[in-house]
């Protein structure tokens, strides 16, 4: 069974956990449609940076 060799102090434990928090995804607004989407991803209706890049089923 694994046993720690030295106890980790509360300060060191906190430093180890410093980057474990969750960050919210960055949301951008499509300028042509005003729709929200994740940065560097196409919007749900197929626009990216003001241009239509993906055709829909009805197009």
Curated annotation (Swiss-Prot):
HAMAP family (alphabetical): Ribosomal_bL32
Chain positions covered by the region annotation Disordered: 1-59
Protein's name according to its UniProt entry: Large ribosomal subunit protein bL32
Keywords in alphabetical order: Ribonucleoprotein, Ribosomal protein
GO terms for MF: structural constituent of ribosome
GO terms under biological process: translation
Pfam families in alphabetical order: Ribosomal_L32p
Keyword Ribosomal protein: yes
Comp. bias intervals (Basic residues): 49-59
GO cellular component, one term: large ribosomal subunit
Family from the record: Belongs to the bacterial ribosomal protein bL32 family.
């Amino acid at each position: 069974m694994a046993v720690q060799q030295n106890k980790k102090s509360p300060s060191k434990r906190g430093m180890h956990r410093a980057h474990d928090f969750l960050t919210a995804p960055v949301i951008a607004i499509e300028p042509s449609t005003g729709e929200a989407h994740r940065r560097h991803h196409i919007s749900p209706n197929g626009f990216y940076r003001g241009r239509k890049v993906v055709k829909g089923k009805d197009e």
